[in-house]
From Swiss-Prot:
InterPro entries: Cyt_c-like_dom (IPR009056), Cyt_c-like_dom_sf (IPR036909), Cyt_c_1A/1B (IPR002327). The modification N6-methyllysine is found at residue 61. This is Cytochrome c. Electron carrier protein. The oxidized form of the cytochrome c heme group can accept an electron from the heme group of the cytochrome c1 subunit of cytochrome reductase. Cytochrome c then transfers this electron to the cytochrome oxidase complex, the final protein carrier in the mitochondrial electron-transport chain. Signal peptide: none annotated. It comes from Wickerhamomyces anomalus.
Length: 109
């Protein structure tokens, strides 16, 4: 996978709205939707958002989320965590992943 490089937070916010917001929230105390709330995800292990029902695959992967691991995951979620229930095909363009992860790193703090 490509090394993560800081991208455009503004473009990342737009990508989040069009590709992620239907299933995820980012704000502290935000609700779980089809997917978990992402607040505080960086530095946390996969499958650990309190109150969200994960697949065994997400729990067993036990990856610690960082800009790099998130970028790798978003390239092809089902390949990175076989058995994940995330029904998103991934972001194939490295630039899109960099922009989205740059946005997420700030929006989920």
């Amino acid at each position: 996978p490509a090394p993560f490089k800081k991208g455009s937070e503004k473009k990342g916010a737009t990508l989040f709205k069009t590709r992620c917001l239907q299933c995820h929230t980012v704000e502290k105390g935000g609700p779980h939707k089809v997917g978990p709330n992402l607040h505080g995800i960086f530095g946390r292990q996969s499958g650990k958002a309190e109150g969200y029902s994960y697949t065994d695959a997400n729990i067993k992967k036990a990856v610690e989320w960082s800009e790099q691991t998130m970028s790798d995951y978003l390239e092809n979620p089902k390949k990175y965590i076989p058995g994940t229930k995330m029904a998103f095909g991934g972001l194939k363009k490295e630039k899109d992943r960099n922009d989205l992860v740059t946005y997420l790193a700030n929006a989920t703090k």
